[in-house]
Swiss-Prot record:
This is S-adenosylmethionine synthase. GO terms for molecular function: ATP binding; magnesium ion binding; methionine adenosyltransferase activity. One of its GO terms (biological process) is S-adenosylmethionine biosynthetic process. Belongs to the AdoMet synthase family. One of its GO terms (cellular component) is cytoplasm. It comes from Acetivibrio thermocellus (strain ATCC 27405 / DSM 1237 / JCM 9322 / NBRC 103400 / NCIMB 10682 / NRRL B-4536 / VPI 7372) (Clostridium thermocellum). K(+) binds at E43. It comes from the Bacteria.
């Protein structure tokens, strides 16, 4: 079959955009730990010496946002002025408003409740917080049912952070990126063609040392040996120097790494970001639900590859559309899989929140190294608890 290449990237927790994602989700978690019914849309921007936290938050609790900001930056590793960004000396500005009452009225009471289709007490009473379409994806390329390029890229970025924090490579600094190019034979990944690592470092270390150490301590422990061969290309800091990094090197914004957060470009994306948003925002909760559905379909053996699209209207509880695409790998027709999805998954916002127990402070841990396919943390949308039911029902169709 034809050989082809596919590439995905990831970034470390010290990347400027990821700093912002983590701050936004740290604020969300702090609020949810006191007020699980809060409405939160928290956006962050960082640049040299400055953090701006803004957005719309409606809650009955108080959280110390500057303290949360400094603590998050400290955990990431920007705790010294020589790194170009210091958690203790950077300025923190906040500008927070309440959620618009025009939006709140649609979320508080769904159209179905207003028109008498459902009672206020039923789960329909919560409407979607916005319109839009969200995608979820799963495939059998890895044990966690993720595309191999993004899976390896995340693991490399995570390893880069680990060797920095545990002192193995103590000259590394928090900012960094990874990129993996995988060669496919048809739709099967067969080898890694190129591995790219860019990592911030201290000025005292030479290029050859960095390249040797990164290959030995980051790449080889992560990439399975059977995927590497004599033709695999290793690119480490290809500019030759990466001392200035983090917010000193580039400004950062919440929600600017949506492809890193999801499937590395391997599947479609509806365009909505995740971090800083409470689960009434379907940009986040419905994307999690779509992954949950797709993963259970693949885990059930109904398809080797599955993409689920959900779409919503603001203030309306039920999805306006549900679509399943198995790319020709399904063992039963897609319309039958869609009927199983509608039967076994409650895709109304309140149904998603209830099924996945989303009104909890679980979000900061997702804000770096991907929201999907995580094996290092327990995320409810990664469960495959519906797979057996789907498998049994499919056998009877």
């Amino acid at each position: 079959m034809a050989r082809k290449l596919f590439t995905s990237e990831s970034v470390t927790e010290g990347h400027p955009d990821k700093i912002c994602d983590q701050i936004s989700d740290a604020v969300l978690d702090a609020i949810f730990s006191q007020d699980p019914m809060a409405r939160v849309a928290c956006e962050t921007a960082v640049t040299t010496g400055l953090v701006l936290v803004t957005g719309e938050i409606t809650t009955n609790c108080y959280v110390d946002i500057p303290k949360i900001v400094r603590s998050t930056i400290r955990e990431i590793g920007y705790d010294r002025a020589k790194y170009g960004f210091d958690c203790d000396t950077c300025a923190v500005l906040t500008s927070i408003d309440e959620q618009s009452p025009d939006i709140a009225m649609g979320v508080n009471k769904a159209l179905e409740a207003k028109t008498g289709e459902m009672s206020d007490e039923e789960i329909e009473a919560i409407g979607a917080g916005d319109q839009g379409m969200m995608f979820g994806f799963a495939c059998d390329e890895t044990p966690e049912l993720m595309p191999m390029p993004i899976s390896l890229a995340h693991k490399l970025a995570m390893r880069l952070s680990q060797v920095r924090k545990n002192g193995t490579l103590n000259y590394l600094r928090p900012d960094g990126k990874s990129q993996v190019t995988v060669e496919y034979d048809g739709d099967k990944p067969v080898r890694v063609d190129t591995v790219l690592i860019s990592t911030q470092h201290g000025p005292e270390v030479d290029y050859d040392t960095i390249k040797r150490d990164v290959i030995e301590h980051v790449i080889k422990p992560v990439i399975p040996a059977e995927l590497l061969d004599s033709k695999t290309k290793y690119l480490v800091n290809p500019t030759g120097r990466f001392v200035i990094g983090g917010p000193q090197g580039d400004s950062g914004l919440t929600g600017r790494k949506i492809i890193v957060d999801t499937y590395g470009g391997y599947a479609r994306h509806g365009g909505g970001a995740f971090s800083g948003k409470d689960p009434t925002k379907v940009d986040r909760s419905a994307a999690y639900a779509a992954r949950y559905v797709a993963k259970n379909i693949v885990a059930a053996g109904l398809a080797r590859k599955c993409e689920v699209q959900l779409a919503y209207a603001i203030g309306v509880a039920r999805p306006v559309s549900v679509r399943v695409d198995t790319f020709g790998t399904g063992i039963i027709p897609e319309e039958k899989i869609e009927s199983l999805v509608n039967k076994y998954f409650d895709l109304r916002p309140a149904g998603i929140i209830k099924t996945l127990d989303l009104r909890r402070p679980i979000y900061k841990q997702t804000a770096a190294y991907g929201h999907f396919g995580r094996t290092d943390i327990d995320l409810p949308w990664e469960r495959t608890d519906k797979a057996e039911e789907l498998r049994k029902e499919a056998q009877s169709l």
